[in-house]
Swiss-Prot record:
Active-site residues per Swiss-Prot or TrEMBL entry: 22 (proton acceptor), 100 (proton donor)
Biological process, per Gene Ontology: amino acid biosynthetic process; aromatic amino acid family biosynthetic process; chorismate biosynthetic process; quinate catabolic process
Binding site for substrate: 74, 80, 87, 101-102, 111
Enzyme Commission code(s) on record: 4.2.1.10
Name of the protein in question: 3-dehydroquinate dehydratase
Organism: Clostridium beijerinckii (strain ATCC 51743 / NCIMB 8052)
Enzyme class: lyase
InterPro entries membership: DHquinase_II, DHquinase_II_sf
Underlying gene: aroQ
Length: 146
C-alpha cells in the first residue's frame, strides 16, 4: 500500500518537549521507525510534518491526487478544533487513521475531544510510536475487508 503519514504542529519537537508525556525518542527516530516497519510490511511510506494547518490540508489533497491507499494523521493540537482538517479528510475519501502518542483521553479535558477523528476510520492513542504501526495494521485490515 501507498501510505501517507502526516504529523501536525509541534510533533517535530518530540524528544525535546514534555518527555514524560511524549517520550524521549526524537521525531527523526520515530519517522525512521515508521519507514522501516512500513517497508518490512511491503508498504511505500511518505512522511510529512507541518506546523501550518493549510499545509496539512494541501498534503491531504495531494494524497488524493497521487492515489494514496491510506493516511495516518497525528493532527497535534488541530485535533481539537480544526474542522478544516476534518473536512479535508472527509473530502478525499481515503481511509485515514488518527494517531496520538499519548492517551489524550487521560489528559486535560480539552484534549479529550477530537473534531478530526469522526472523519477517520479509527483512532490510536496512548501507544507512543507504536501507534503508527498499529495504524498501518488497521489500514491493512481495512483493505483486506474490502
Amino acid at each position: 500500500m501507498k501510505i501517507m503519514v502526516i504529523n501536525g504542529p509541534n510533533l517535530n519537537m518530540v524528544g525535546v518537549r514534555e518527555k514524560g508525556i511524549y517520550g524521549a525518542k526524537s521525531f527523526e527516530d520515530i519517522c525512521e521507525y515508521i519507514k522501516e516497519e512500513g517497508k518490512k510490511r511491503g508498504h511505500e511510506i511518505t512522511l510529512f510534518q507541518s506546523n501550518c494547518e493549510g499545509e496539512i490540508i494541501d498534503e491531504l489533497q495531494k494524497a488524493y491526487f497521487e492515489n494514496y491507499d491510506g493516511i495516518i494523521i497525528n493532527p497535534g493540537a488541530y485535533t481539537h478544533y480544526s474542522y478544516a482538517i476534518h473536512d479535508a479528510i472527509k473530502g478525499i475519501n481515503i481511509d485515514t487513521v488518527e494517531v496520538h502518542l499519548s492517551n489524550v483521553h487521560a489528559r486535560e479535558d480539552f484534549r479529550k475531544k477530537s473534531v478530526t477523528a469522526p472523519a477517520c476510520i479509527g483512532q490510536m492513542c496512548g501507544f507512543g510510536e507504536d501507534g503508527y504501526i498499529l495504524a498501518i495494521k488497521a489500514l491493512e485490515l481495512k483493505k483486506m475487508s474490502k
